[in-house]
């Protein structure tokens, strides 16, 4: 059985006059024609505007004002209609989303009183659907937190700007339904590349500059200490004379001024340490000079060795050439020598020897020719 409208709506229809019932009848016919064409698949925002009605397609529906049956309940009698309509509506086809069969995909039954009495939804409330409840805190927190974490100096102005933006969003929700520009990238991140190096640069330079500044103080510490000690003991001459004067001049200087035992001990200590320092400097200087001289001598000897090696190679090559030439000369001479029988001498059995006067003799190998005057 089809659902019926509530009792309040039915009583409201009973109290209407005849003229008002005629106007409601026309309005209801227009609504039914629109729902039959569109299949009642409209969105959740109903729009019932009488200025643009759909064309009239056929005879009007039954005279009932609700999806109930034609016979009303016994407890709620209805007045007779002002005019009679055809009882049979068999010539009008029943669409799939017909009103009589209630094949309408809605959550509550449709009634004339309900449609007319139900107020339209507020457009601002519709725009608020999907927005998170509560104040827009996530948009303000990233800016203020990131500014503090990155040592950004303008964190207070960013916080005020985020508060002002939240107030505007609450006032003008219809103009700015969803805002993301401030949450995508905080403004402090754009300045992080410039603020971090400026803060780290002095820290990186301080350790390196400290030892460099302390070196001149360490070098002049001994001299300044001797000067302070001499000034405290009231020595009447500077420390440069104590260290640099020769022995005779230094003794004359001490004899010229009457000094106490403590002053003499201090002067001799300053001279001893100054002389040791000068001697150490001279020793280092002599060592450096000796090292430089040895390096130069080593370089000279290396060059001389290379020259001698080249000369030895040339001498070996010359000696080899002379041996080859001597062998060829032996072969040539023995080819021209003949004995009484006309036979040639063998180089393996005979050898050529030269006397002191330059005469050359042919002698058997293994014998030596005695020198003759």
Curated annotation (Swiss-Prot):
Task: Tell me how the protein is altered or processed after translation.
Answer: Phosphorylated on serine residues. In undifferentiated erythrocytes, phosphorylated by MAPK8 which then leads to ubiquitination and protein degradation.
Any idea which residues bear Phosphoserine here? 157, 170
Could you tell me which residues belong to the region Transactivation domain?
1-206
Question: Matching Pfam families, A to Z?
Answer: bZIP_Maf (PF03131)
Domain of life from the UniProt record = Eukaryota
Identify the residues that the record assigns to the bZIP domain, covering every copy: 266-329
GO CC aspect terms: chromatin; cytoplasm; nucleoplasm; nucleus; PML body; protein-DNA complex; RNA polymerase II transcription regulator complex
A Gene Ontology biological process term: integrated stress response signaling
Location in the cell: Nucleus, PML body; Cytoplasm
Q: What is known of its domains?
A: The PXY motifs are required for binding WW domains. PXY1 is required to promote transactivation of beta-globin and for hyperacetylation of histone H3, but not for binding to the HS2 promoter site.
Note the subunit structure: Homodimer; can bind DNA as a homodimer. Erythroid transcription activator nuclear factor erythroid-derived 2 (NF-E2), composed of a heterodimer of NFE2 and MAFK, possesses transactivation activity on beta-globin. Also forms high affinity heterodimer with MAFG; the interaction promotes erythropoiesis. Interacts (via the PXY motif 1) with ITCH (via the WW 1 domain); the interaction promotes 'Lys63'-linked ubiquitination of NFE2, translocates it to the cytoplasm and inhibits its transactivation activity.
Name this protein carries in UniProt: Transcription factor NF-E2 45 kDa subunit
Organism per entry: Homo sapiens
Name the gene behind this protein: NFE2
């Amino acid at each position: 059985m089809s659902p019926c409208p509530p009792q309040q709506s039915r009583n409201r229809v009973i109290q209407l006059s005849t003229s008002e019932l005629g106007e409601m009848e026309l309005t209801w016919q227009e609504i039914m024609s629109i729902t039959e064409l569109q299949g009642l698949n409209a969105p959740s925002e109903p729009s019932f505007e009488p200025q643009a009605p759909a064309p009239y397609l056929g005879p009007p529906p039954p005279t009932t004002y609700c999806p109930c049956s034609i016979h009303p309940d016994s407890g709620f009698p209805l007045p007779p209609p002002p005019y009679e309509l055809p009882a049979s509506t068999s010539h009008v086809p029943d669409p799939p989303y017909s009103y009589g069969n209630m094949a309408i995909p809605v959550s509550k039954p449709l009634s004339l009183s309900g449609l007319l009495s139900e107020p339209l939804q507020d457009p601002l409330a519709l725009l608020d659907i999907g927005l998170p409840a509560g104040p827009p805190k996530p948009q303000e927190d990233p800016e203020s937190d990131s500014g503090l974490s990155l040592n950004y100096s303008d964190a207070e102005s960013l916080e005020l700007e985020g508060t002002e933006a939240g107030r505007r969003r609450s006032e003008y929700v219809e103009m700015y339904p969803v805002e993301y520009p401030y949450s995508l990238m905080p403004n402090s991140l754009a300045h992080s590349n410039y603020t971090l190096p400026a803060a780290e640069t002095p820290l990186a330079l301080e350790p390196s500059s400290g030892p460099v500044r302390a070196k001149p103080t360490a070098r002049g510490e001994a001299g300044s200490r001797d000067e302070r000690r001499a000034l405290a003991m009231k020595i009447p001459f500077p420390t440069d004379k104590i260290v640099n004067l020769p022995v005779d001049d230094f003794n004359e200087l001490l004899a010229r001024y009457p000094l106490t035992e403590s002053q003499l001990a201090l002067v001799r200590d300053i001279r001893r340490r100054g002389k040791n320092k000068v001697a150490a400097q001279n020793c280092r200087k002599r060592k450096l000079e000796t090292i430089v001289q040895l390096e130069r001598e080593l370089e000279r000897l290396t060059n001389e060795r290379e020259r001698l090696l080249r000369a030895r190679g040339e001498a070996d090559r010359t000696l080899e050439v002379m041996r080859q030439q001597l062998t060829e000369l032996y072969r040539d001479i023995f080819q021209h020598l003949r004995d009484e029988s006309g036979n040639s001498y063998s180089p393996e059995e005979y050898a050529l020897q030269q006397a002191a006067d330059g005469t050359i003799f042919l002698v058997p190998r293994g014998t030596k020719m005695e020198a003759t005057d």
